């Protein structure tokens, strides 16, 4: 076998142009399809980079308010369903961020004070929000910034904690820096600034009624299931609370129903946003790989035709047909392995080039 391998390498070296074209073609074909498969797997299994135990995260969706929920309703589900360890609410918004008189547009969120703890995200500098920082409307002008923003606008200065920035013309104090891996709760959209939910008026110019009123269903949310609780069990518990809320709050919840969806099934998740695009890319890459395979087959057939004289001489000299076929097969295997390995390296580079994965 080792002799066949050395012979295959010598034969491939005799036609460097054909060999190089075949390897590059295979690398592109294999690399593209492996890249898309890796992206798809990551989006389904880990749609929120930097978040711990994502398989336990779900979203409650209502049949009103565009699918969003109210804080009182969500609090009742957590307290009464018995299947959640906690939940958070958030609202995304584009915001004007001004640092040292230099303004830019950025993606911001108002979010529950318990969000970072619930998601298992620990700051690399400073702290997360305190439990009471989303209770008093407008009373806690503090923010946590992303590692990207910290690096880009503050040159990774560790003394950033305590600095004041202007968000939509309101002053906020930086109390923490999120880790690099955490991009927010709406990946693939990158969030750079988080403020407590109590600052909804200052950040989003929206009524503080969203903080306390049951009919004000404007919040996106994430809830964490207790270990071992399935999606079906959670939905059954939610149905029980649905009925209770309909009875106890008939004026606001008579026609309101909530259901549980998985993290990957959230309408704003990376899987939902990019899934159709990745499926299309996967089909395109599969077609490219088939074309590559057909082209390489044609090249190898042409090469075999050119070697007819050589093979005839070897047969006339008493060479074994099986041995010749084995050597030709070894050449094809070597070519495939080298091209495939190059494709895997190309795919690894492509996956690493996408920070969300």
Model-derived features: where do they sit?
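Alpha-helical transmembrane segments
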Residues: 28-56, 301, 350-357
């Amino acid at each position: 076998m080792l002799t066949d391998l050395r012979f295959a390498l010598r034969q491939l070296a005799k036609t460097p142009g054909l060999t190089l074209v075949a390897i590059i073609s295979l690398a592109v074909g294999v690399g593209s399809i492996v890249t898309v498969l890796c992206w798809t797997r990551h989006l389904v299994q880990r749609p929120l980079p930097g978040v711990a135990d994502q398989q336990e995260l779900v979203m409650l969706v209502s049949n009103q308010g565009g699918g969003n929920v109210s804080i009182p309703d969500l609090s009742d589900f957590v307290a009464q369903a018995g299947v959640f360890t906690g939940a958070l609410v958030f609202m995304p918004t584009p915001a004007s961020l001004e640092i040292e008189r230099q303004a830019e547009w950025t993606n911001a969120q108002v979010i529950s004070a318990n969000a970072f703890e619930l998601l298992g995200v620990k700051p690399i500098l400073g702290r997360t929000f305190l439990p009471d920082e989303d209770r008093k409307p407008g009373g806690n002008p503090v923010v946590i910034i992303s590692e990207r923003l910290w690096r880009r606008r503050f040159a990774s200065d560790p003394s950033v904690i305590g600095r004041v920035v202007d968000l939509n013309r309101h002053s906020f104090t930086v109390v923490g820096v999120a880790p690099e891996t955490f991009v927010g709760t709406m990946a693939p959209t990158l969030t750079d600034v988080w403020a407590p939910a109590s600052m909804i008026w200052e950040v989003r110019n929206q009524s503080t009624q969203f903080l306390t009123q049951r009919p004000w269903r404007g919040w996106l949310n994430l809830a964490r299931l207790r270990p071992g609780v399935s999606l079906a069990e959670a939905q059954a518990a939610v149905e029980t609370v649905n009925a209770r809320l309909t009875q106890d709050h008939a004026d606001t919840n008579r026609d309101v129903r909530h259901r549980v969806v998985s993290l990957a099934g959230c309408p704003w998740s990376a899987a939902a946003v990019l899934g159709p695009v990745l499926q299309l890319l996967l089909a395109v890459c599969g077609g490219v790989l088939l074309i590559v395979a057909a082209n390489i087959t044609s090249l190898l057939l042409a090469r075999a035709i050119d070697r007819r004289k050589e093979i005839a001489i070897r047969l006339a000299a008493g060479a074994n047909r099986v041995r010749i076929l084995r050597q030709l097969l070894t050449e094809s295997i070597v070519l495939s392995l080298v091209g495939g390995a190059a494709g895997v390296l190309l795919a690894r580079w492509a996956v690493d080039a996408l920070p969300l994965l």
